[in-house]
Amino acid sequence: KKSCHTGWLKSAGMLIPMGYLIGNGYAEVIGDPTEIDSLEATVYGFFSEDSSIPRGCSPYSSYKGAMRCMMEGAGDIALIKDTVYDSYCTGSDAHDWCLDRDEVVMLEPFGQAPSHPALYNPENMDLETISLQEALGALNEDQEGADILWDLLYTKDMIPTNAQDHLGTYGAAVSNVPGIQADFG
């Protein structure tokens, strides 16, 4: 089967699914398990040499592009977020390349990429950082603040958390990707 990925080393379209497949014994790492470039050979070995792994801008990069890749027949499976179909293939803005909902099979989600957090080091907290953190948290308190968060950050709220809770199962799945610890650990 030919796979359509959102891009090289992208969370939902590459790291989570491949980490899941490797970690659960479905896919075997091809190449040096300490080298991130082995991931490409692993994808091609598990799926197909004709799989789409965009690097940079192409019609098949991003969530929309990976779905389009599958729907136009360039691939057999799109590795995307579960919300992508509704974002691009429903309503008056649906793209002409979209298949009808009953023509696609959507699997149950098996992992989730963490949101894009605002990070700070608690050991280096100065008054300016504390003020910023409090201001961001206060935006959750009313509709005007929620509108600001949506307009600026495309999120509906800011939730205080720690790295371990925030990463959840993502860290476990991604740790199975060859070379991830050496390159990013």
Task: Give short role names for the model-derived ranges.
Residues 2-6, 76-80, 119:
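Structural recognition of the beta-strand scaffold that forms the well-ordered cores
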Residues 17, 83, 114-117:
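Proline-rich low-complexity regions
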Residues 22-23, 63-101:
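A ligand-binding cleft/hinge motif common to bilobed small-molecule-binding domains
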Residues 120, 124-185:
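An extracytoplasmic/periplasmic, membrane-proximal ligand-sensing/linker region
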